[in-house]
Regions:
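A non-catalytic, helix-rich entry segment at domain boundaries
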Residues: 43-147, 153
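Polybasic (Lys/Arg-rich)
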Residues: 234-267
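Solvent-exposed, amphipathic alpha-helical segments
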Residues: 39-50, 244, 248
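Hydrophobic (often cysteine-bearing) scaffold residues that line and stabilize catalytic clefts
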Residues: 32, 36, 40, 121, ...
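Short cysteine clusters
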Residues: 14, 263-266, 272
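C-terminal, charged and often intrinsically disordered regions of DNA end-processing helicases
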Residues: 1-34
Length: 277
């Protein structure tokens, strides 16, 4: 059975959280922070789709000239090839105001308890969009895909997930993951298992190594980047870690590992008898 990285993340946070969510199927309510983060991701996905839309006609013209040859070229590689020829996606349609409008269309307000809190979150999102636009405008960008799904084999397991944004750079492929949480340290980014999985996914999708993994943290104070790479040995270690976690899942090892940090973020802390908070 395929497993998403979010399932691996829940198990790593606490095996009981995984058990409640994926084995016992106990529902949980989405928090205001999760709702806000989801709205930000939707807005940036639509922004990336707007970028891609500006190149669709040109890509179609060039691939049509390839005739029957294009049938043997994967769609992902065609998009990457397109990125090699179009480094600058900035145009009159890609403005800060258009991004704000996309945010208004993407923002989900009904998870907030009051209209005041919803309005505050909406205005906060506007500021985050401005911060993102300032970051985005710094250099020409060539987006290859947004919210790109993947499915890769890790030993006997299938692991699925989505890449927030993929860009083509002069060096190769850059994977960008958006965050609305507090920034992690550089050491945490360098050791992050999710980013290692993303590097494996990029190599699978494009038949070439990922040259940069970038965590982009969006906050009221601005944007914070955590850029990292993965070596062959790190990718091998990531495969081993994921397989070991899968084996523990299959062995039904759901012994809880409570901690203040994990329990504070757990949606099941109200029903768990060993919750640390």
């Amino acid at each position: 059975m395929p497993l998403s990285y979010s399932q691996f993340r829940r198990y790593r946070a606490c095996p009981r959280q995984f058990e409640f969510s994926n084995i016992k199927k106990i529902p949980w309510g989405i928090s205001e922070g999760e709702s806000f983060g989801a709205s930000v991701h939707v807005a940036l996905k639509r922004w990336g789709e707007l970028e891609l839309g500006l190149r669709t006609e040109d890509l179609g013209q060039r691939t049509s000239k390839m005739g029957s040859k294009k049938e043997s070229v994967r769609e992902d590689q065609l998009l990457l090839f397109a990125g090699e020829h179009h480094g600058d996606t900035h145009s009159s349609k890609l403005t800060a105001q258009s991004l704000i409008e996309i945010w208004h269309q993407s923002f989900v307000f009904n998870t907030f308890p009051t209209q005041f809190e919803a309005d505050f979150a909406r205005r906060r999102g506007e500021e985050l969009m401005r911060r993102f636009f300032a970051w985005w405008s710094q250099v020409p960008r060539s987006v290859v895909a947004v919210e790109k799904g993947f499915s890769i084999e890790i030993d006997a397991s299938t692991v699925t997930g989505r890449l927030d944004r993929i860009e083509r750079t002069e060096q190769g492929v850059r994977i960008i993951d958006f965050k609305t949480t507090a920034p992690c340290t550089q050491q945490e980014a360098d050791a992050d298992l999710q980013l290692s999985l993303y590097a494996l996914a990029a190599e699978h999708l494009f038949d070439q190594p990922c040259t940069e993994l970038l965590l982009l943290f969006l906050s009221d104070e601005g944007t914070v980047e955590r850029s990292t790479v993965r070596s062959a040995s790190q990718l091998k270690d990531a495969r081993t870690q994921l397989q070991l976690i899968r084996e523990r899942m299959e062995a039904k090892d759901f012994r809880p590992t409570p901690s203040v940090a994990a329990c504070k973020r757990c949606p099941y802390r109200g029903i768990c008898d060993v919750a640390a908070v």
